[in-house]
């Protein structure tokens, strides 16, 4: 609402992951179409030259991971002079991923006159410290949720000596349609993809060691129904 169609960056959104940056950019793009407002996601794993060309063509909102945002700022391909809004999404996730120094470096170079919105599932001390240091008289809005499980989700716990065999029995008897399986580690994802593949299941893995192009290909196959099972780290 307060972003104009002037061809300079007016809002910065920090996200912990490439996937979230892309998702946020897509949603902002839908909203901004009628106002001729462009949003651009920037992240590692994509050629920086392509991002620089898009930035030079003129965008109003940039969404990105802290490391890549900082890279552009140091190259002067992202200029902070006209930033009116800063959004920090999933701040505690960025803290866990070791981005807090990059976040602080970006925040301290922004114009003093701006609005900052910081979203976080938890408020650990380093995040609170950032709010006190770089926000003016911030208001804390806390949402207390008593139900920790979505009401339409049924949960079942299975005790089994062989997880893969137990999973295959579930796939054969109980589960129809698309399925997402979460594993604790990237190695666990790769091993389960191989184990299910040797048993004839159409499964693909998704984790941080894949390039962005590989991730995009996996997601397209899953959405199109060419793969039944998506195995991922969270």
Regions found by a protein language model. Give the residues of each.
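Conserved helicase RecA-like core
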Residues: 1-234
């Amino acid at each position: 609402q307060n972003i104009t169609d002037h061809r300079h960056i007016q809002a910065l959104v920090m996200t912990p992951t490439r996937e979230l940056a892309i998702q946020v950019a897509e949603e902002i793009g839908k909203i901004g179409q009628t106002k001729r407002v462009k949003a651009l996601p920037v992240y590692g794993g994509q050629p920086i030259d392509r991002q620089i060309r898009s930035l030079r063509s003129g965008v109003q909102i940039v969404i990105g991971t802290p490391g890549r945002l900082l890279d552009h700022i140091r190259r002067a391909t992202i200029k902070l002079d006209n930033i009116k809004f800063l959004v920090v999404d999933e701040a505690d996730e960025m803290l866990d991923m070791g981005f807090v120094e990059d976040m602080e470096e970006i925040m301290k170079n922004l114009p003093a006159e701006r609005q900052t919105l910081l979203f976080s599932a938890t408020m650990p001390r380093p995040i609170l410290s950032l709010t006190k240091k770089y926000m003016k008289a911030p208001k804390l809005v806390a949402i207390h949720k008593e139900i920790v499980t979505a009401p339409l989700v049924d949960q079942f716990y299975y005790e089994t000596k062989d997880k893969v065999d137990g999973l295959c029995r579930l796939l054969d008897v109980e589960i129809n349609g698309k399925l997402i399986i979460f594993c604790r580690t990237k190695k666990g994802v790769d091993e389960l993809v191989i184990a299910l593949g040797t048993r004839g299941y159409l499964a693909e893995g998704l984790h941080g060691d894949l390039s962005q192009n590989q991730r995009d290909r996996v997601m397209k196959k899953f959405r199109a129904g060419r793969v039944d099972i998506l195995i991922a780290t969270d």
